[in-house]
């Protein structure tokens, strides 16, 4: 009897032992599966967060890996990249120290508490003596973005060209969008350190580079006989590429405007072309503010009337900044095809980042960007159907003391106009995150408050919390202009009296209400004081500017005849 009980007990114990071994084996297999599955997730750039409501620190720190420079004008086919290595980052650091010493030596009498802040932040958490090897820590969130199914540049660019050439036909084309949206890792713009880090990445693109011969030509197609000549590298756009340790998140920072007379600018900077592209993207019609201004394109027809098709063609010209920014993105995508790419930039760089981000459905954080919504519409960039633009992955961060960001730096007496900038737009796409420093700190509205390091040291690092992002207020740019599609004649100007009246009419081509100024009944003639146009019967002798100085005044003209339509 005892023997039978012992046998049963031994049998149960062996069964229990085998069961434990089976459970242990299954647990080991499960851990192996989870381990390899998590590797797959990392390779696909999908980051799993422990808390869905709070941003999590992304794996690995972000460092500068590549610097792009892209030519414009005659050198618009040329693009080069500089890979950051230990050797050249040390050399760049020594150059930065020399530049800082030079600035300190010339800073006598300048109204600045710390000369370093004009070249880099003086905040203790981010201070460094070498911006080229600084390690950034960023947080991210998961967000559903509505993006096109096919976002390959080989599809996007021909579609945009078609939409610009035949907007009516393009409106009938159905674009495939990802059904229900797509989960994408986006910057956590509620985290102060992340916002400051992205702003510093934007400022990094302004830091001057010493001469080096380590640039690689990545132009497509590349032809050694097709060289732009001397000086192209200081006459274009720059993009700085930051990558984390796992190479699954990439941040592209696009350089903004270099303004003559501001710290960090000079003859080796891109002042002239920056101003041309500013005036092309953010003016109502080719920077035609008054008859005293020389236009940056030939689309102005008459008073408050502009050739819309001509304007759209001018913005998309291959030798301008928008195309150059897209080329920088395309080569970065070629190097990191499986990474999630973010865009950032300050001022003009922020606007270009926003335009490229909307083109390819990329998360974008722009700082102090002028209103770019009008430029996005003129470029016929894709907007998700039925989804308001503010519900997308684009954030515009700025403050109330910056007239460029707020859209108030216009008019003949404004500082922008005096400096030769026609900043006439104020409407942003995406969401706006505004610091009210006028109310909170008593700041005065001043164009000098537009500088990136004023924003970083005076606002972003001083506030305890980041600004709340919200949908922009209803906004219409250039409401008093008539934009005529190609082939359409401007309406004759008639009225019952010789006094000037203001009438409200609707223009179908732009699908918005415009205010048109009507004068007495007679054939329109150009202002005799305007040197840019001369009318002969049904033809107009027009002049186009070939070269400008930094103020924007034309120094060389070319003339041509244009038939009135």
From Swiss-Prot:
TM stretches of this protein: 22-42
InterPro entries to which the protein is assigned, alphabetical: AB_hydrolase_fold, ATG15_Lipase, Fungal_lipase-type
Catalyzed reactions: a triacylglycerol + H2O = a diacylglycerol + a fatty acid + H(+)
SUPFAM superfamilies: alpha/beta-Hydrolases (SSF53474)
Documented EC number(s): 3.1.1.3
CDD domains assigned: Lipase_3
Record field: compositional bias (Basic and acidic residues): 519-528
Ion transport as UniProt keyword: no
Any one GO cellular component localisation term in the record: multivesicular body membrane
Gene Ontology molecular functions: phospholipase activity; triacylglycerol lipase activity
Record-linked PANTHER family: LIPASE ATG15-RELATED
Function: Lipase which is essential for lysis of subvacuolar cytoplasm to vacuole targeted bodies and intravacuolar autophagic bodies. Involved in the lysis of intravacuolar multivesicular body (MVB) vesicles. The intravacuolar membrane disintegration by ATG15 is critical to life span extension.
Family affiliation: Belongs to the AB hydrolase superfamily. Lipase family.
Name listed for the protein in its UniProt record: Putative lipase ATG15
Gene this chain is encoded by: ATG15
């Amino acid at each position: 009897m005892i023997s039978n009980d012992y046998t049963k007990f031994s049998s149960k114990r062996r069964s229990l032992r085998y069961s434990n071994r089976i459970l242990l084996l299954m647990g080991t297999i499960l851990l192996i599966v989870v381990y390899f599955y998590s590797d797959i997730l990392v390779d696909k750039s999908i980051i799993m967060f422990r808390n869905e409501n709070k941003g999590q620190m992304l794996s690995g720190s972000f460092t500068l890996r590549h610097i792009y420079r892209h030519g414009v004008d005659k050198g618009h086919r040329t693009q080069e990249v500089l890979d950051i290595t230990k050797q050249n980052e040390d050399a760049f650091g020594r150059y930065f120290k020399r530049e800082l010493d030079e600035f300190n030596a010339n800073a006598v009498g300048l109204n600045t508490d710390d000369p370093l802040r004009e070249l880099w932040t003086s905040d203790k958490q981010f201070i460094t003596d070498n911006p080229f090897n600084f390690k950034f820590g960023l947080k991210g969130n998961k967000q559903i973005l509505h993006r096109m199914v096919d976002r390959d540049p080989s599809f996007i660019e021909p579609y945009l060209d078609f939409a610009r050439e035949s907007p009516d036909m393009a409106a009938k084309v159905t674009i495939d969008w990802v059904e229900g949206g797509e989960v994408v890792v986006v910057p956590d713009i509620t985290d102060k350190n992340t916002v400051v880090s992205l702003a510093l990445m934007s400022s990094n693109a302004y830091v001057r580079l010493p001469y080096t011969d380590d640039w690689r030509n990545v132009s497509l197609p590349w032809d050694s006989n097709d060289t732009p000549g001397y000086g192209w590298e200081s006459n274009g756009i720059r993009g700085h590429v930051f990558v984390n340790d796992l190479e699954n998140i990439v941040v592209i920072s696009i350089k903004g405007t270099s303004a003559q007379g501001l710290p960090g600018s000079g003859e080796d900077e891109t002042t002239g072309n920056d101003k041309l592209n500013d005036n092309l993207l953010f003016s109502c019609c080719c920077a035609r503010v008054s008859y005293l201004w020389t236009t940056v394109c030939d689309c102005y027809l008459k008073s408050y009337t502009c050739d819309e098709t001509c304007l759209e063609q001018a913005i998309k010209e291959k030798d301008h900044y928008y195309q150059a920014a897209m080329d920088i993105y395309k080569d970065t995508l070629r190097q990191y095809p499986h990474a999630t790419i973010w865009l950032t930039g300050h001022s003009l760089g922020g606007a270009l980042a926003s335009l490229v981000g909307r083109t390819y459905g990329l998360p974008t954080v722009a700082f102090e960007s002028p209103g770019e919504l009008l430029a996005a519409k003129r470029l016929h960039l894709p907007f998700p159907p039925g989804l308001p633009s503010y519900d997308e992955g684009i954030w515009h961060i700025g403050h109330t003391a910056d007239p460029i960001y707020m859209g108030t730096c216009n008019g003949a007496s404004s500082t922008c106009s005096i400096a030769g900038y026609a900043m006439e737009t104020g409407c942003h796409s995406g969401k706006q995150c505004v610091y009210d420093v006028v109310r909170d700190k008593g700041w005065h509205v001043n164009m000098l408050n537009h500088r990136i390091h004023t924003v970083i040291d005076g606002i972003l690092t001083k506030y305890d919390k980041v600004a709340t992002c919200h949908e922009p207020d209803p906004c219409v740019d250039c409401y008093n202009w008539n934009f005529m599609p190609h082939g359409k004649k401007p309406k004759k100007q008639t009225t019952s009296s010789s006094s000037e009246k203001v009438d409200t009419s609707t223009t179908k081509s732009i699908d918005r209400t415009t205010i048109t100024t009507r004068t007495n009944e007679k054939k329109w003639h150009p202002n005799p004081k305007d040197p840019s146009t001369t009318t002969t019967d049904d033809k107009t002798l027009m002049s186009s500017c070939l070269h400008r100085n930094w103020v924007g005044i034309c120094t060389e003209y070319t003339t041509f005849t244009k038939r009135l339509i």
